[in-house]
Amino acid sequence: RKMEENKIYICLENGNVFEGKSFGAKGEVIGELVFTTGMGGYIETLTDPSYFGQIVMQTFPLIGNYGFIEEDKESEKSFVSAYIVREWCEEPSNFRCEKGLDDYLKENNIIGVYGVDTREITKTIREAGVMNAIITSNPATVDYGKLKAYKVKDAVKSVSCTKPYMSASQEHKYNVVLI
């Protein structure tokens, strides 16, 4: 299946604007832009609670080649605000694959951006430090004052468990209780 390619923009609080293409959910989002250098483990990254309120960018050039596998998740849901990659694989190849990255992002209302120079954006963040960004289809309407003022709020409350849960083992040897 061939996707319709829609232009989307990453606008950094320092005024830099990067044009890319949209995948995953549609919309607009503000977040703290960070990058990760992992060569794999994108499922774990997407479901890592420490990325709450952040727009996560992968520096590895191709993401999504083994699809999405529920068993590999770090938590029950995704906490990233948006996801940026250089290139993503539309048709993953893995016997464990349950769905593609695009489908996962859509199901979890996460905006994805691909087709941008992640090296240049990473260099900007490395030199200037972590900064806020907005992903939008209309960069002319960005309120840079609002963008600079953005702060991640209620992170701990938002990622903490609200009820007890049990993690079962396939080879049960001991009973462990955490209080």
What role is predicted for each listed range?
Residues 2-179:
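RNA-binding accessory domains that recognize and position tRNA/RNA substrates
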